Amino acid sequence: MNTVIMILVVMTIIGLIFGLVLAYVNKRFAMEVNPLVDLVEDVLPKGQCGGCGFAGCKAYAEAVVLDESVPPNLCVPGKAAVAEQVAKLTGKSAPPIEPRVAHVRCGGDCTKAVKNFEYEGIHDCVAANLLEGGPKACKYGCLGFGTCVKSCPFGAMAMGSNGLPIIDTDICTGCGTCVSACPKQVLGFRPVGSKVMVNCNSKNKGGAVRKACSVGCLGCGLCAKNCPNDAIKVENNLAVVDQSICASCSEATCLAKCPTGAIKAIVSGTDLQQQSKNEAAANS
């Protein structure tokens, strides 16, 4: 019994000694925390998306407060409102931000894209891509397993019934998480005011594209030749729309001239279910 009591006393003394040592170390080597960091972090949306280039909101708050070279407008989800608040707190100037949203640069859904084989592995785009680039004949197209949807920290994406992801542009913050998650680089950004986009990501020549997908861009250049604003160019066998020039002419010349319908008018909406119907109709 005495031995047990002695052990308890010794352990208690050791615990007290360690506690005192830790308290001293904590006080002696404590780093001063700038209260402004917490104030800046409080105005950030807490999406932890990393779109700012830092490892989360706390890291960005520390950087923008402590480093003069870090601008106050890097929080993409926060947009102009958050940029203005951060600028006010830090005494920095916030240049204007062009609002952007993510866009799926592929129209090759399960009814239009040719498959080379049936994939029965892990339901994940990264995993499927490891097997010969995925089951689709087009190695630039969306694999349709929803890795981007799962990665979205704001719930702005859903998988459509046609096997392509749908983006709710009223929820999308343009943070870029889905863009980074896609192994095919199918997802990209577009300005919020965009009117038309090329729903194709293939760099293959027209003949190969036609064999792999019925709605792929052939790189024929008809859209570029007929655009009254000279806003379209063909680069690497793919039509590219310069959104700073495109005025979405009332005739919608590029849409009418595209032989495969790869160029589409932008579809936006707040309800993902309704947008799914709109996307299906637009791709039909």
Curated annotation (Swiss-Prot):
<dbReference type="InterPro" id="IPR017896">
    <property type="entry name" value="4Fe4S_Fe-S-bd"/>
</dbReference>
<feature type="binding site">
    <location>
        <position position="223"/>
    </location>
    <ligand>
        <name>[4Fe-4S] cluster 4</name>
    </ligand>
</feature>
<comment type="function">
    <text>Part of a membrane-bound complex that couples electron transfer with translocation of ions across the membrane. Couples electron transfer from reduced ferredoxin to NAD(+) with translocation of H(+) out of the cell. Essential for energy conservation during autotrophic growth. Contributes to ATP synthesis during heterotrophic growth.</text>
</comment>
<feature type="binding site">
    <location>
        <position position="49"/>
    </location>
    <ligand>
        <name>[4Fe-4S] cluster 1</name>
    </ligand>
</feature>
<feature type="region of interest" description="Hydrophobic">
    <location>
        <begin position="1"/>
        <end position="26"/>
    </location>
</feature>
<feature type="binding site">
    <location>
        <position position="227"/>
    </location>
    <ligand>
        <name>[4Fe-4S] cluster 4</name>
    </ligand>
</feature>
<dbReference type="GO" id="GO:0022900">
    <property type="term" value="P:electron transport chain"/>
</dbReference>
<dbReference type="GO" id="GO:0005886">
    <property type="term" value="C:plasma membrane"/>
</dbReference>
<feature type="binding site">
    <location>
        <position position="138"/>
    </location>
    <ligand>
        <name>[4Fe-4S] cluster 2</name>
    </ligand>
</feature>
<keyword id="KW-0411">Iron-sulfur</keyword>
<comment type="subunit">
    <text>The complex is composed of six subunits: RnfA, RnfB, RnfC, RnfD, RnfE and RnfG.</text>
</comment>
<keyword id="KW-0520">NAD</keyword>
<dbReference type="Pfam" id="PF12838">
    <property type="entry name" value="Fer4_7"/>
</dbReference>
<keyword id="KW-0472">Membrane</keyword>
<keyword id="KW-0677">Repeat</keyword>
<feature type="binding site">
    <location>
        <position position="254"/>
    </location>
    <ligand>
        <name>[4Fe-4S] cluster 5</name>
    </ligand>
</feature>
<feature type="binding site">
    <location>
        <position position="220"/>
    </location>
    <ligand>
        <name>[4Fe-4S] cluster 4</name>
    </ligand>
</feature>
<feature type="domain" description="4Fe-4S ferredoxin-type 3">
    <location>
        <begin position="206"/>
        <end position="237"/>
    </location>
</feature>
<feature type="binding site">
    <location>
        <position position="52"/>
    </location>
    <ligand>
        <name>[4Fe-4S] cluster 1</name>
    </ligand>
</feature>
<feature type="binding site">
    <location>
        <position position="152"/>
    </location>
    <ligand>
        <name>[4Fe-4S] cluster 3</name>
    </ligand>
</feature>
<dbReference type="InterPro" id="IPR010207">
    <property type="entry name" value="Elect_transpt_cplx_RnfB/RsxB"/>
</dbReference>
<keyword id="KW-0813">Transport</keyword>
<dbReference type="InterPro" id="IPR007202">
    <property type="entry name" value="4Fe-4S_dom"/>
</dbReference>
<dbReference type="GO" id="GO:0051539">
    <property type="term" value="F:4 iron, 4 sulfur cluster binding"/>
</dbReference>
<feature type="domain" description="4Fe-4S ferredoxin-type 4">
    <location>
        <begin position="239"/>
        <end position="269"/>
    </location>
</feature>
<keyword id="KW-1003">Cell membrane</keyword>
<feature type="binding site">
    <location>
        <position position="217"/>
    </location>
    <ligand>
        <name>[4Fe-4S] cluster 4</name>
    </ligand>
</feature>
<dbReference type="GO" id="GO:0009055">
    <property type="term" value="F:electron transfer activity"/>
</dbReference>
<feature type="binding site">
    <location>
        <position position="148"/>
    </location>
    <ligand>
        <name>[4Fe-4S] cluster 2</name>
    </ligand>
</feature>
<comment type="similarity">
    <text>Belongs to the 4Fe4S bacterial-type ferredoxin family. RnfB subfamily.</text>
</comment>
<feature type="binding site">
    <location>
        <position position="75"/>
    </location>
    <ligand>
        <name>[4Fe-4S] cluster 1</name>
    </ligand>
</feature>
<keyword id="KW-0479">Metal-binding</keyword>
<feature type="binding site">
    <location>
        <position position="249"/>
    </location>
    <ligand>
        <name>[4Fe-4S] cluster 5</name>
    </ligand>
</feature>
<protein>
    <recommendedName>
        <fullName>Proton-translocating ferredoxin:NAD(+) oxidoreductase complex subunit B</fullName>
        <ecNumber>7.1.1.-</ecNumber>
    </recommendedName>
</protein>
<feature type="binding site">
    <location>
        <position position="142"/>
    </location>
    <ligand>
        <name>[4Fe-4S] cluster 2</name>
    </ligand>
</feature>
<dbReference type="InterPro" id="IPR017900">
    <property type="entry name" value="4Fe4S_Fe_S_CS"/>
</dbReference>
<dbReference type="InterPro" id="IPR050395">
    <property type="entry name" value="4Fe4S_Ferredoxin_RnfB"/>
</dbReference>
<feature type="domain" description="4Fe-4S ferredoxin-type 1">
    <location>
        <begin position="133"/>
        <end position="162"/>
    </location>
</feature>
<feature type="binding site">
    <location>
        <position position="175"/>
    </location>
    <ligand>
        <name>[4Fe-4S] cluster 3</name>
    </ligand>
</feature>
<keyword id="KW-0408">Iron</keyword>
<feature type="binding site">
    <location>
        <position position="178"/>
    </location>
    <ligand>
        <name>[4Fe-4S] cluster 3</name>
    </ligand>
</feature>
<feature type="binding site">
    <location>
        <position position="246"/>
    </location>
    <ligand>
        <name>[4Fe-4S] cluster 5</name>
    </ligand>
</feature>
